[in-house]
Swiss-Prot record:
UniProt xrefs under SUPFAM superfamilies: P-loop containing nucleoside triphosphate hydrolases
CDD domains (alphabetical): ParAB_family
Highest taxon listed in the record's lineage: Bacteria
A Pfam short name: VirC1
Taxonomic source organism: Rhizobium radiobacter
Alphabetized UniProt keyword annotations: Plasmid
Name this polypeptide is given: Protein ParA
C-alpha cells in the first residue's frame, strides 16, 4: 500500500504537523498507519511520547540513511499507509525516501521564502524521477494559513505554483492552536482532553485536509 513522504528543505515549514495530522486522521478513519521519524529534531517521536499513541498507528524512530529503504519496504503492506517525516535538508536519506514514495507532500507556509526553498524540493523530486525513470506524484500543502484572511502573498504564491503546473492540496492546513498542542498532549484531535481553541473547526479542517491527501494518493496509485 501507499508510501507518503513529507519533505521540505526548510525547517519550520510544518512537516511534522502535516505528518501527524494526516496520520492521526487516517488512523481515526480506520486506516492502519506506520509513521517513520527520520528528522533529527524527532518531532514525531515527541508527539508519540507525549501521550498514548492512537489505535491503528505504529510510530518508529531512529530510522537512518542506511535503514530507511528497508524500513519502508518492511511496513509497506496491503491495507496500510506509511508516512515518512523527513529531515529539513536535502540529503541522501531524503533522496532515498523520495525514490520509494507513491506521493510526496511539500509543506510550505504562505511566505515567499518558503516558496523559494520549496522549489528546491520540487527540483529534487524531478531529479529522482530522472534517476529511477518513473513519475513520482507530488503536491504542495500549505500550512499555518490564517483561518480568517487569505493574504495577497498567499494567493500570489498559490497562483504562481498553479501556473507552473504544481498541484496543491485543498484545503490548506490552517493555523490552529490544537495542531501545535498535539506535540504537547499526544494522541489525536478527537481524544484531546485539554481543549485548545476552536476544536470543532480544527477537526473539520484536519479531516478535510487528510481526505484530500488520501484522494490524491488514491489517484496516484491508479
Amino acid at each position: 500500500m501507499p508510501v507518503v513522504v513529507v519533505a521540505s528543505s526548510k525547517g519550520g515549514a510544518g512537516k511534522s504537523t502535516t505528518a501527524v495530522v494526516l496520520g492521526t486522521e487516517l488512523a481515526h478513519k480506520g486506516v492502519p498507519v506506520t509513521m517513520l521519524d527520520c528528522d533529527p529534531n524527532r518531532s514525531l517521536t515527541i508527539w508519540a511520547n507525549a501521550g498514548e499513541v492512537p489505535e491503528n498507528i505504529t510510530a518508529l524512530s531512529d530510522v537512518t540513511e542506511s535503514s530507511i529503504v528497508k524500513t519502508i519496504k518492511q511496513h509497506d503492506v496491503d491495507g496500510a499507509v506509511v508516512i515518512v517525516d523527513l529531515e529539513g535538508v536535502a540529503s541522501r536519506m531524503v533522496s532515498r525516501a523520495i525514490s520509494q514514495a507513491d506521493l510526496v507532500l511539500i509543506p510550505m507556509r504562505p511566505k515567499a521564502l518558503d516558496a523559494t526553498i520549496g522549489a528546491q524540493s520540487l527540483q529534487l523530486i524531478a531529479e529522482e524521477e530522472e534517476a529511477i525513470d518513473r513519475k513520482i506524484a507530488h503536491a504542495v500543502v500549505f500550512t499555518m494559513v490564517s483561518p480568517a484572511i487569505r493574504s495577497h502573498e498567499y494567493t500570489g504564491i498559490k497562483a504562481s505554483l498553479i501556473e507552473n503546473g504544481v498541484e496543491i492540496i485543498e484545503p490548506p492546513l490552517v493555523e490552529r492552536t490544537a495542531y501545535s498542542a498535539l506535540f504537547q498532549f499526544g494522541g489525536n484531535l478527537h481524544s484531546m482532553k485539554s481543549k485548545q481553541g476552536n476544536m470543532a473547526a480544527a477537526i473539520e479542517n484536519a479531516e478535510a485536509f487528510a481526505m484530500a491527501i488520501f484522494k490524491k494518493l488514491t489517484e496516484a496509485l491508479r
